[in-house]
From Swiss-Prot:
Name this protein carries in UniProt: Serine hydroxymethyltransferase
Residue positions binding (6S)-5,6,7,8-tetrahydrofolate: L118, G122, H123, L124, E243, S351, P352, F353
PTM annotation (N6-(pyridoxal phosphate)lysine): residues: K227
InterPro entries, A to Z: PyrdxlP-dep_Trfase (IPR015424), PyrdxlP-dep_Trfase_major (IPR015421), PyrdxlP-dep_Trfase_small (IPR015422), Ser_HO-MeTrfase (IPR001085), Ser_HO-MeTrfase-like (IPR049943), Ser_HO-MeTrfase_PLP_BS (IPR019798), SHMT-like_dom (IPR039429)
Keywords of this entry: Amino-acid biosynthesis, Cytoplasm, One-carbon metabolism, Pyridoxal phosphate, Transferase
Subunit structure: Homodimer.
Pathway(s) per entry: One-carbon metabolism; tetrahydrofolate interconversion; Amino-acid biosynthesis; glycine biosynthesis; glycine from L-serine: step 1/1
Catalytic activity: (6R)-5,10-methylene-5,6,7,8-tetrahydrofolate + glycine + H2O = (6S)-5,6,7,8-tetrahydrofolate + L-serine
Primary location recorded for the protein, binned into one broad class: cytoplasm
Function as written in the Swiss-Prot or TrEMBL entry: Catalyzes the reversible interconversion of serine and glycine with tetrahydrofolate (THF) serving as the one-carbon carrier. This reaction serves as the major source of one-carbon groups required for the biosynthesis of purines, thymidylate, methionine, and other important biomolecules. Also exhibits THF-independent aldolase activity toward beta-hydroxyamino acids, producing glycine and aldehydes, via a retro-aldol mechanism.
Length: 427
């Protein structure tokens, strides 16, 4: 593997090998990350990357599209079957571009949209001022009840009645509870708004049938294809409304994109096929079991979990009672081979670059085959590290760093990722 890269560009070869080592021997707990199968990776690295295919299957602006048409048709068919949708667009390069396409298809610049506040668990593209969504549209953010730390649906309704948004966005990047899509649709209908659900984080759970399917209530659904879906990096748009489908297709191409990434679209098709298996369903069940177990283990050790737990693949740990910042915790854990990300919490008092919490997700460690027993081990290691941080830069006592780094390596060696499947690379 990578022998041609090694010959042509030793510097990038070194990057590939060292990143492989980092993934193989480190604990990946970033909720938005996962490990794609070699089938997905091989497809992404194929000669399909050479082909331009502006347009849609059978309606291209270039010749020679017979085989890429077939790849995109398979991706569309499988996405529709997987999520029970009548229409699917598999061309978005990312989740952000999927969201942009829906906004521009259903609203005009200057129109009002509602989305969850970033500091309460939303996403940049749901109306953050620094993002295109916050610059192009008038944004009315909603949040969580500060006591329950779950979505305040009465407040969502009050804001919707007051501001009459064109689009209401449900979904987030750091919200651990199941969202009441029915309630959101009722609110949207009451004010004549479109309901858009961004299921990027929990799409894999939906595909496996262990999480409510937002398509039952949403006018349109967006997603990424990595994260819990465990596919290539990319976006997806689903709807049951033919008029919305037409508008979305025109907005993706020629509206905001040119040539689609055919190597990625083919890899999406592979990912969707993998997601139809019983093995994938069992995997998703274990992802949630692992998240619940790890959250419980943190609570046993005196940590506060935002909203008191999780229904999904992720949870937020409030570090305020431990007198450590999210930034320091992230650095401390990374020095021991454990990757998480700092994250704001509801009613955040610190900058997003410092934050008071960390977000933890179980998709990647579950892909390795880890179960509840290992979640207890991981929680114990994280607690040991965070209890031995000696400064605001996240420096860990040397003896603790050495001890935990060794334990992380041993745990990862018990659950190999790629090393027993890749030939020609010594790691």
């Amino acid at each position: 593997m990578w022998k041609h890269v090694k010959q042509v560009d030793p510097e990038i070869y070194e990057v590939l090998v060292n990143e492989l080592k980092r993934q193989e021997y480190g604990l990946e707990l970033i909720a938005s990350e996962n490990f794609a199968s070699l089938a997905v990776i091989e497809t992404m690295g194929s000669m399909l990357t050479n082909k331009y295919a502006e347009g849609y299957p059978k309606k291209r602006y270039y010749g020679g599209c017979e085989w890429v048409d077939r790849a995109e048709e398979r991706a569309i068919e499988r996405a529709k079957r997987l999520f029970g949708a009548k229409f699917a667009n598999v061309q978005p390069h990312s989740g952000s571009q999927a969201n942009m396409a829906v906004y521009l298809a259903l609203a005009q610049p200057g129109d009002t949209i509602m989305g969850m506040s970033l500091s309460h668990g939303g996403h940049l593209t749901h109306g953050a001022p620094v993002n295109f969504s916050g610059k192009i549209f008038k944004v009315v953010p909603y949040g969580v009840n500060l006591e329950t730390e779950t979505i305040d649906y009465d407040e969502v309704r009050r804001l919707a009645l007051e501001h009459k948004p064109k689009i209401i966005v449900a979904g987030g990047s750091a919200y651990a509870r199941i969202i009441d899509f029915k309630r959101f649709r009722e609110i949207a209908d009451e004010v004549g708004a479109y309901l858009m659900v961004d299921m990027a984080h929990f799409a894999g759970l939906v595909a496996a049938g262990i999480h409510p399917n937002p398509l039952e209530y949403a006018h349109v659904v967006t997603s990424t294809t990595h994260k819990t879906l465990r596919g290539p990096r990319g976006g997806l748009i689903l709807t049951n409304d033919p008029e919305i489908a037409k508008a979305v297709d025109k907005t993706i191409f020629p509206g905001i994109q040119g040539g689609p990434l055919m190597h990625v679209i083919a890899a999406k098709a592979v990912c969707f096929k993998e997601a139809m298996t019983e093995e994938f369903k069992e995997y998703q069940k274990q992802v949630v079991k692992n998240a619940k177990k790890m959250a419980e283990e943190f609570q046993k050790r005196g940590y506060r979990i935002v909203s008191g737990g999780t229904d999904t693949h992720l949870f937020l740990v409030d570090l305020t009672p431990k007198d450590i910042t999210g930034k320091a915790a992230e650095k401390a854990l990374e020095s021991c081979g454990i990757t998480v990300n700092k994250n704001t919490i509801p009613n955040e008092k610190r900058s997003p670059f410092v934050a008071s919490g960390i977000r933890i997700g179980t998709p990647a460690v579950t892909t390795r085959g880890m179960k509840e027993e290992e979640m207890e081990e991981i929680a114990e290691m994280i607690d040991l590290v965070l209890s031995n941080v000696i400064d605001e830069n996240g420096t860990v006592k040397p003896e603790v760093r050495e001890e935990v780094s060794k334990k992380v390596r041993e745990l990862c060696e018990r659950f190999p990722l790629y090393r027993d499947k890749i030939e020609g690379v010594e790691i």
